Amino acid sequence: FLPIDFEETKTAVKTNIRSKQLANEYLAQDIPVLIFPSGMVSTADKMGFGSVVDAPWTTFAAKIIREAEATVVPIYFHGCNSRKFHIASHISEPLRMALLVHEALRMFGQTMQVEIGAPIHWPELAKQGGRSDLTNFLYQQVQNLAQP
């Protein structure tokens, strides 16, 4: 587990630099690294009663991919948290986090449907431009896996 800290503090910067270094070390050893680019669990909009949407993806993953010239395997996780979780997500971050643990425990031992895309090798990824363009490209690749 490589922690990513979204706070705007010196400690967060140190944590994120170290996590990026470790990710690059793992990739150099051909050890796969799984990254959730939004850094958050998807949440239903409209106070928990709308469509489930990802938080905006950060360019952190794109930076690591570009530095390592890594191959990417897009993965889409199907699943749905409870309505209670989605409503709480709009009320209180501590409540959301507490319920996230509950949601994980609720699914313990259950089968989760996962779609795994074809590997996208560095030469194809390099054509996507800068970090933002690469992030947008990868987002679309993952979302394409969600389609029936």
Predicted regions and their residues:
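Membrane-interfacial amphipathic helices and adjacent loop/beta segments
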Residues: 1-18
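Non-catalytic C-terminal accessory region of glycerolipid acyltransferases
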Residues: 13, 17-148
